[in-house]
Amino acid sequence: MYARPDLKYPLLFALAKCSVAVLCFAMVWLDIAVFHTEILEISFTEITQELMLALCALLFWTAPGTGRKSGFEFLAAGFFACLLTRELDGLFDPISHSAWLWPFLAIAAVAIGNAVSAKHRQRTVQALGAFMRTPTFAALATGFAVLIFSRIFGMGSFWHQVMGDSYQRLAKTTAEEGVELLAYGIWLCASFEYWVKCRLAESWSPQTATS
């Protein structure tokens, strides 16, 4: 007889993804239909984007598993922390328009330096190679593709073509930021799945994953 498949966690992850999709729409809807924030720096959409990136970094940074911490976790957490710094550029604008670049570079230097250090280099390469063969990496790659689409889809010249003389910047911003929020939501779900599977100490963890 075949063993009954354990569907608890696949269903949990599917529910999480659906919930995040609904959350993304709800945040945009609150900004546009209820509070009329125009999706500026202080808005439900922007703040949710920042929280999602912070959670992604935290989930990779705190991924459990005795003796399995390697430069890979630092690298992944640093990637999301760098994106968070870029999203928080409004906090640095009073200093200068590009002040966000300095903490961005500092975080990147620490994360990359740790990952390629003599202590972690070999394990980082092995962990990264193994991680790239997991469904979680595919989900992160999908989120990255959606993020690229949001940038292209949000080009002002494109929306001028779509709306002509009726062009309104808010329409462009809503579409761009909404799709960007969805990309971060996909990343958050993937990060959550990674954390849970590491917590369960399943065989696909970065040192041993093969599928």
Which stretches of residues belong to each language-model region?
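Short aromatic-rich membrane-water interface segments that cap or initiate transmembrane helices
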Residues: 37-48, 167-181
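C-terminal transmembrane-bundle signature of multipass membrane proteins
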Residues: 150-161, 175-205
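Membrane-proximal helix-loop-helix units in multi-pass membrane proteins
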Residues: 77-132
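Alpha-helical transmembrane segments in multipass membrane proteins, preferentially the mid-helix core
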Residues: 56-61, 109-130, 141-142, 146-153
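Juxtamembrane "helix-exit" motif on the non-cytosolic side of transmembrane helices
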Residues: 27-37, 85-93, 153-163
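Membrane-interface helix-boundary motifs at transmembrane edges
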Residues: 4-8, 61-71, 121-134
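Membrane-interfacial loop-to-transmembrane alpha-helix junctions, especially the N-terminal start
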Residues: 9-18, 67-78, 135-140
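Hydrophobic cores of alpha-helical transmembrane segments in multi-pass inner/ER membrane proteins
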Residues: 17-22, 49-62, 104-119, 178-194
